[in-house]
Amino acid sequence: MACGSSLDSIDMNSIPLVALNYTVRHRLCLYLNPDAVVAADWTRLAEEMGYDYLEIRNFQRYPDSTMKLLEDWEKKCFRATVGGLLEMLKKMERNDILTDLGPLIEADCMKYLEKKHVPLPIQDDKVDSSEQYRITKSDDPYGSMPETFDAFICYCAQDISFVQEMISRLEQTDYKLKLCVFDRDVLPGTCLWSITSELIENRCRKMVVIISDDYLDSSDCDFQTKFALSLGPGAREKRLIPVKYKPMKRPFPSILRFITVCDYTNPYTKAWFWDKLAKALAR
């Protein structure tokens, strides 16, 4: 995409898909809706977004499959950003779309950013601005674009080495997942419990619970796990992913026994561990 100089300093992955207006979406549909023998169409885009065969077949029922796909992805995925869409189109080698729609996309993004730079409402002196708007290091200071993550990592200090390996394996590889690691990402000086609750409930799609003997003694981990479990009985199995990365001397926590464990200690499945975990988080 031939980006204009006005957007050279903007991270397109920070701009949500809602920034794209109808004109861009309609033209994108004109490119992707027709069945193509050579060029990748909307079904390939759906695969890049993580949809499976049956879900893609379901989209075929709609007269405008591409438009329906974009709307569904926007609702379900926290990472539905303009940058994410552009990366997928580039991977599909649809340079024709990037070239043709580039100026329109840039214009929509600039309009979106301009709308966000509006004067803040008068704030109560009793409410600290960092507490009201900024929770994480990459949060928008004006509160218009809160930082979101693929997963909140529930861990105790003794297991930090495995957390660092998770960062290396899941963020710094082709998986390109975004993890919320409290000690790395959260700003100091805010209420611990309210910030943790906000992150788990509203900022993170999933929560990885790193289980160990030390985890069982952590009051912070206990609160985070029980809070996540309390959010919704129907969705908690999809939200919570327990990970066992080393042998334990004490019994596995009973409140997590009904959820499938991602077991790093099993020598027979260890080779598939990271790929399975990454796909579970991206789902």
Swiss-Prot record:
Keywords, ordered alphabetically: Cytoplasm, Immunity, Inflammatory response, Innate immunity
InterPro entries: DEATH-like_dom_sf, Death_dom, MyD88_Death, Myelin_different_resp_MyD88, TIR_dom, Toll_tir_struct_dom_sf
Top-rank lineage group of the source organism: Eukaryota
Annotated region described as Intermediate domain, given as residue ranges: 106-143
Subcellular location: Cytoplasm
GO biological process: defense response to Gram-positive bacterium; inflammatory response; innate immune response; MyD88-dependent toll-like receptor signaling pathway; positive regulation of canonical NF-kappaB signal transduction; Toll signaling pathway; toll-like receptor 4 signaling pathway
All copies of domain Death, residue ranges: 27-105
Gene Ontology terms: cellular component: cytoplasm; plasma membrane
UniProt domain TIR: residue ranges: 147-281
Any GO MF annotation of the entry: Toll-like receptor binding
Major localization class: cytoplasm
Keyword Cytoplasm set for record: yes
Function: Adapter protein involved in the Toll-like receptor and IL-1 receptor signaling pathway in the innate immune response. Activates expression of target genes in the Spemann organizer region during early embryonic development. Is required for normal axis formation.
Notes concerning its domains: The intermediate domain (ID) is required for the phosphorylation and activation of IRAK.
Record's protein name: Myeloid differentiation primary response protein MyD88-A
Lineage: Eukaryota, Metazoa, Chordata, Craniata, Vertebrata
